A protein has these predicted regions:
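TPR/TPR-like (Sel1-like) alpha-helical repeat modules
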Residues: 19, 30-44, 118-142, 156
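Structural motif corresponding to the intra-repeat A-B loop/turn of tetratricopeptide repeats
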Residues: 21-26, 83, 117-120
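OB-fold and OB-like single-stranded nucleic-acid-recognition modules
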Residues: 167-340
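Long, ordered, amphipathic alpha-helical scaffolds
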Residues: 130-183
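Mature extracellular/secreted ectodomains of secretory-pathway proteins
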Residues: 118, 126-130, 147, 267-272
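A contiguous binding-surface segment within folded domains or other stable secondary-structure elements
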Residues: 81-113
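Canonical positions in the second alpha-helix
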Residues: 1, 39, 95-96, 133
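Amphipathic alpha-helical repeat scaffolds of TPR domains
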Residues: 3-24, 38-53, 63-79, 105-113, ...
Length: 340
């Protein structure tokens, strides 16, 4: 339909009401867009000083002009969302929030537009907008309780899926977003993959030997475990100084025989699950209690995938932490004869 570009009332009503249509047609959207753009392009003319009613003061006239401009940009943003023109939607609703920060509905639209652009590096910004939309009170431009609850539920679900369960972080984001309409420069929420990588790196730095062992175990229990063992471990000393690691560390499960053993079974990943069997080239002195921490390096010779276990040939000198001592031989003194 053709819109009278000089009729403020007609343009205003079309711009206002297009957002209220439950299922706007392409023609409805086109008319709304034309009307909103007509308002913006004729704004100075519509609100010229010589057109101000005598009963309206200057401040109210200027406010009416600003409100009309905001309505036009709000409508253009909404129309762009319906058309899946997400870049335009983002630009228009950002203009609205820059002029009127307290508008939960528009904050939600901004978050929706950012997500729809499918740029994962910007999802933190979208979460900020969802948090704000679900946190603003009605007196601050928030939505009615039912709509607010729906958006907040969506925010929680989206946050947890992106970042993982973090009640403290979620509550903090709510407070930050409620206080200001846009996140600060450099704002970032780490996603689950980034957090996983970060935690793995921290773990590796604090427990390099255990981290290496867990990586080996992951390879060995994977679909190509046997091939990995034969090509990368069997017959070679492990860990062998790789990444600066000289020894693995485990806890004693059992020793055979109990005294002066030549075979040790150790747990590494957790203290109760046997994972390695050490065959020694010479018996160790004395004995050790289960749970004793043992360090070792050796040559893998066999591997069981299902009930995970690696057998190592180990030189006695490459065992550290063994507390047993050789028994001190009893010295027998000859009997002293008495003089008769």
């Amino acid at each position: 339909m053709q819109t009278d570009a000089k009729n403020l009332t007609a343009l205003y009503l079309i711009t206002l009401n297009v957002q209220r249509l439950p299922k706007p047609s392409p023609d409805d959207l086109a008319s709304g867009e034309e009307a909103a753009k007509g308002l913006i392009s004729n704004l100075d003319n519509f609100f010229a000083a010589d057109k101000k009613p005598a009963t309206t003061n200057d401040a109210d006239w200027e406010k009416a002009k600003k409100d009309t401009e905001l309505l036009a940009h709000t409508s253009l943003g909404w129309i762009a969302l319906q058309k899946k023109d997400n870049d335009t939607a983002e630009k228009e609703v950002t203009k609205v929030l820059q002029s009127n920060p307290n508008n939960a509905q528009v904050s939600y639209w901004l978050g929706t537009a950012i997500v729809a652009e499918k740029k994962p590096e910007r999802y933190s910004e979208a979460l900020w907008q969802f948090a704000r939309a679900g946190s603003l009170d009605q007196a601050q431009g928030g939505l009615n309780p039912q709509a607010r609850e729906q958006i907040d539920t969506y925010f929680i679900h989206t946050y947890n899926r992106y970042h993982g369960q973090d009640p403290q972080g979620l509550a903090q984001l709510r407070e930050q977003a409620k206080a200001q309409p846009f996140p600060p420069a450099g704002f970032k929420i780490e996603n689950v993959e980034e957090l996983k990588a970060k935690n793995e790196e921290e773990f590796r730095k604090k427990n390099p030997a255990l981290a290496m062992w867990m990586n080996l175990k992951q390879e060995l229990t994977g679909p190509n475990g046997e091939q990995y063992f034969n090509n990368n471990m069997k017959g070679a000393e492990v860990p062998g100084g790789a990444e600066g690691i000289q020894y693995f560390k485990g806890k004693l499960i059992s020793a055979r025989p109990a005294v002066r053993p030549k075979e040790l079974v150790l747990a590494i990943t957790d203290p109760n699950t046997p994972e390695v069997t050490l065959n020694l080239d010479a018996p160790l002195p004395g004995k050790a209690e289960p749970g004793t921490e043992i360090e070792f390096a050796g040559v893998p010779t066999a591997f069981i995938k299902d009930a995970f276990n690696i057998t190592f040939d180990v030189e006695k000198k490459k065992i550290a932490g063994w507390p047993g001592k050789e028994a001190v031989p009893v010295r027998r003194h000859a009997a002293v004869r008495k003089k008769g």
